Amino acid sequence: MPTINQLVRKGREKRRKKSKAPALQFVYSRVGRNAGKLRQVPKGNPQKRGVCVAVRTMTPKKPNSALRKIARVRLTNGIEVTAYIPGEGHNLQEHSVVLVRGGRVKDLPGVRYHIVRGALDAKGVENRRQGRSKYGTKKPKQ
């Protein structure tokens, strides 16, 4: 237990909070002697652009059973991540340019990111009536 004098002199050290989407926190330095090097920024980015390296399926943990669609994406900062493709059906293939956001998939180990539907090369989900904004679907004509 520190004395009051020790606390006045040193103070308490803040606990560093671990990011749930670390790949979105790295950016390339553009200027200075660290130009071209990766550096970590405290807030990071809400989304990042990337290119699909591989598109495949994955089986979830017990007790679930399915073939979940995932893509391996190389982000603009050079980091490669595994991202989930939400919704029914997709048009993604190798070399597709996608927008990646944070957000894990609970039953897929190692999948901490989602692909944003309706942005860049990822088309919105066809014939979706409810929750359209999450799947990049336009309002249907009456």
From Swiss-Prot:
Alphabetical UniProt keywords: Methylation, Ribonucleoprotein, Ribosomal protein, RNA-binding, rRNA-binding, tRNA-binding
Cellular component terms (Gene Ontology): small ribosomal subunit
InterPro entries for this protein: NA-bd_OB-fold, Ribosomal_uS12, Ribosomal_uS12_bac
Record-level GO BP terms: translation
Function: With S4 and S5 plays an important role in translational accuracy. Interacts with and stabilizes bases of the 16S rRNA that are involved in tRNA selection in the A site and with the mRNA backbone. Located at the interface of the 30S and 50S subunits, it traverses the body of the 30S subunit contacting proteins on the other side and probably holding the rRNA structure together. The combined cluster of proteins S8, S12 and S17 appears to hold together the shoulder and platform of the 30S subunit.
Naturally occurring in which organism (per UniProt): Thermomicrobium roseum (strain ATCC 27502 / DSM 5159 / P-2)
Protein encoded by which gene: rpsL
Modified residues (3-methylthioaspartic acid): D107
Domain of life: Bacteria
One Pfam family hit: Ribosom_S12_S23
Official protein name in the record: Small ribosomal subunit protein uS12
Composition skew (Basic residues), residue ranges: 9-20
Record field: transmembrane: none
The family this protein is said to belong to: Belongs to the universal ribosomal protein uS12 family.
Region of interest called Disordered, as start-end residue ranges on this chain: 1-21
A GO molecular-function annotation: structural constituent of ribosome
Subunit description: Part of the 30S ribosomal subunit. Contacts proteins S8 and S17. May interact with IF1 in the 30S initiation complex.
